[in-house]
Structures are given as structure tokens and as C-alpha cells.
């Protein structure tokens, strides 16, 4: 093997290895084929039977985005529980109220302090504020 380049040595090793996979014995034989990565992949991969929803999930016209096909597979397979869905959706870690920028955002703050201060009502534009006030007061009173 002296004088051969590294690629020739790797190719020779692959011929021996895949000869072992195909025939069960080492050595170059007359029946050995040229190495193809597709052949090697088909020899070592594990196959499963095709499922009935494969055409929906893996069809590029139905679900073009691969990450969406994973979520679709989960929904069709197990119902996509909320705890699993939470792993895919990025969460907002900012706790400061987006309306007043003074306190942490909580239900109590949003429906009492922010409304009483008028921060929420002043942030909504092009809306008749008089017609909205009774609805907001119902939330503030806990109805």
C-alpha cells in the first residue's frame, strides 16, 4: 500500500467493509459492485412500514415547511398535547407590562392598575372609548 494516497486507502477500506456487509466474508471478489453511498445507506438503515398519514405530512404541497410537518405529524399521531406544543413555540421572557412599563405584567395589574391609570385606554387608537368602558369595568369588577 506504499505510495497510495489517503483517498485510495479509504476507498479500499470501504470496498472491504461493504463486501463484508453484502457477502458476509472479507476480500475482494468478482461479484463485488462499485461503491455507491445509496447502496450503503440502504444496507444499514432501518425501514418501517408506510403509515396512512405519510402522504399528508410529507407532501411538499400540503405542508411545505419541514418544521410544520413535524408538528403536523405530532398532531395526527398523538393529538399534540399542550406540553409538547410549548417546546415548539418561543416564549416571551419579558415580565414588564407592555402598556405602562412600570410594573410586572400580571392579571391583577392588567385589569386594575393599568386600566385605572388609563394606560390601556390611551394606547388604543381610533376606537370609541365610551362604548368600551362598560366592558372594561365588567372585567375590573370580576364579572
Swiss-Prot record:
It comes from the Eukaryota. Keywords: Mitochondrion. This is Uncharacterized mitochondrial protein AtMg00120. Pfam families: zf-RVT. InterPro entries: RVT-Znf. It is found in: Mitochondrion. One of its GO terms (cellular component) is mitochondrion. It comes from Arabidopsis thaliana (Mouse-ear cress).
Amino acid at each position: 500500500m506504499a505510495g497510495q494516497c489517503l483517498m485510495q486507502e479509504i476507498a479500499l477500506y470501504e470496498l472491504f467493509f461493504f463486501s463484508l456487509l453484502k457477502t458476509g466474508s472479507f476480500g475482494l471478489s468478482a461479484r463485488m459492485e462499485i461503491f455507491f453511498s445509496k447502496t450503503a445507506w440502504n444496507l444499514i438503515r432501518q425501514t418501517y412500514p408506510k403509515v396512512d398519514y405519510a402522504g399528508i405530512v410529507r407532501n411538499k404541497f400540503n405542508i411545505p415547511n419541514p418544521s410544520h410537518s413535524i408538528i403536523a405529524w405530532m398532531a395526527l399521531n398523538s393529538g399534540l398535547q399542550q406540553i409538547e406544543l410549548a417546546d415548539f413555540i418561543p416564549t416571551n421572557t419579558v415580565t414588564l407590562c407592555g402598556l405602562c412599563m412600570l410594573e410586572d405584567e400580571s392579571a391583577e395589574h392588567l385589569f386594575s392598575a393599568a386600566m385605572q391609570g388609563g394606560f390601556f385606554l390611551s394606547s388604543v387608537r381610533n376606537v370609541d372609548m365610551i362604548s368600551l368602558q362598560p366592558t372594561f369595568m365588567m372585567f375590573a369588577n370580576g364579572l
